[in-house]
């Protein structure tokens, strides 16, 4: 069994660089002091994100392949949320010396598979030793002549729409924490057809947590269709919708009946998790309220699905992959005569299902 400490940095790079995608916009890839990417638009969209062992992933659940897929997903989704097309990533990887080389090569394969649908290249980065696994990625994107879609553009009358799955990652995490699903999974990609789970439904939820599969093409389609605001939902629907509401100075009201297909996909897992954790009777009777509440929490507050939330002008035909889930309203005066704060409601009512993910409180 070969470990990282058994090889030099150059020998490790010789194993992983050939596994990485070059990318259609790459003019100069790994091997020099810096990479060179084409920028036909004249502008770069740039974002960065970090994953830390035992904070964002756990090696008892996640293989190197899983972490590579997750790292690609959460970075590429940020570019898609601006209405841009991802073009290239630079990756910094910190690995303890006793890490198996197979973990590192698996990471490279996962990163490559995560980029495959976008044409983005893994064009360089850095490799270092350290006390725990850390991944930091900076990703670039191309607007292709369009304006970036900001969080601050939502206007009263706009339609709120969603692309991707809701609550699956949170349910997958719960299944792992309760021991109801064993890992590791195979390296097969997550397959989703019209919101319906394929193969083993619990395993698909766990795969959504370990290897998020964001609707990257939907971001470009939204930008082309004239979306007024958009973001990547990594921290929970209510928390992230609130970011659009505050940036735009509006009220967002979400449809209480939205995400029916996701609810159906989650209910079996919720019943099992409720039984395993003592939330309530998993059969008929009062326990069903606990199950519904758990599904609500996953839908409204569950993070790391990396779906997209956007607003579109009323009357706009929603692009492929998008579903209407709410409405944008003007912020009305508060009862005391002052100005009410931008907010998010569900069916016109405030709902407390937890705060969503916060890096310093969760």
Question: Could you say what each language-model-derived stretch is?
Answer:
Residues 192-242, 292, 301-307:
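Polyanion-binding loop/helix "lid" in catalytic or ligand-binding cores
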Residues 45-48, 132, 149-221:
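Short, acidic (Asp/Glu-rich) active-site segment that either coordinates a divalent metal cofactor
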Residues 39, 87-179:
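Glycine-rich anion-binding loops of enzyme active sites
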Residues 1-21, 62, 96-121, 128-135, ...:
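Glycine-/charge-enriched secondary-structure boundary and capping motifs
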Residues 36, 75, 83, 122, ...:
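Residue-level signal for inorganic ion chemistry
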């Amino acid at each position: 069994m070969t470990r990282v400490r058994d090889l030099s940095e150059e020998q490790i790079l010789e194993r992983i660089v050939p596994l990485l995608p070059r990318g259609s916009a790459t003019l100069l890839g790994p091997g020099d002091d810096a990479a060179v990417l084409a920028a036909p638009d004249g502008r770069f969209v740039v974002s960065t994100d970090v994953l830390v062992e035992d904070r964002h992933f756990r090696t008892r659940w996640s293989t190197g392949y899983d972490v590579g897929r997750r790292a690609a997903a959460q970075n590429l989704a940020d570019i898609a949320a601006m209405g841009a097309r991802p073009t290239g990533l630079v990756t910094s990887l910190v690995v303890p010396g006793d890490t198996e080389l197979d973990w590192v090569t698996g990471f490279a394969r996962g990163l490559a598979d995560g980029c495959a649908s976008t044409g983005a290249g893994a064009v360089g980065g850095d490799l270092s030793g350290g006390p725990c696994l850390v991944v930091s990625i900076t990703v670039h994107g191309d607007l292709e002549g369009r304006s970036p879609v900001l969080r601050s553009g939502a206007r009263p009358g706009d339609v709120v729409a969603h692309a991707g799955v809701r609550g699956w990652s949170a349910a997958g995490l719960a299944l792992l924490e309760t021991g109801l699903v064993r890992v590791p999974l195979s390296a097969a990609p997550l397959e989703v057809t019209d919101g319906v789970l394929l193969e083993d439904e619990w395993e698909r939820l766990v795969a959504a947590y370990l290897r998020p599969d964001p609707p990257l093409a939907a971001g470009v389609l939204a930008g082309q269709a004239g979306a007024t605001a958009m973001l990547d939902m990594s921290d929970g629907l209510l928390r992230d919708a609130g970011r659009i509401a505050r940036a735009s100075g509006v009220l967002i009201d979400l449809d209480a009946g939205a995400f029916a297909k996701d609810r159906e996909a989650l209910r079996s897992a919720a019943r099992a998790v409720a039984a395993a954790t003592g939330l309530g009777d998993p059969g008929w009777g009062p326990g069903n309220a606990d199950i519904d509440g758990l599904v609500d929490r996953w839908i409204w507050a569950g993070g790391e699905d990396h779906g997209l939330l956007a607003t579109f002008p009323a009357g706009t035909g929603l692009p492929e992959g998008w579903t209407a889930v709410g409405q944008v309203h003007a912020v009305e005066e508060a009862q005391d005569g002052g100005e009410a704060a931008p907010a998010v409601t569900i069916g016109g009512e405030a709902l407390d299902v937890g705060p969503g993910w916060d890096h310093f409180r969760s």
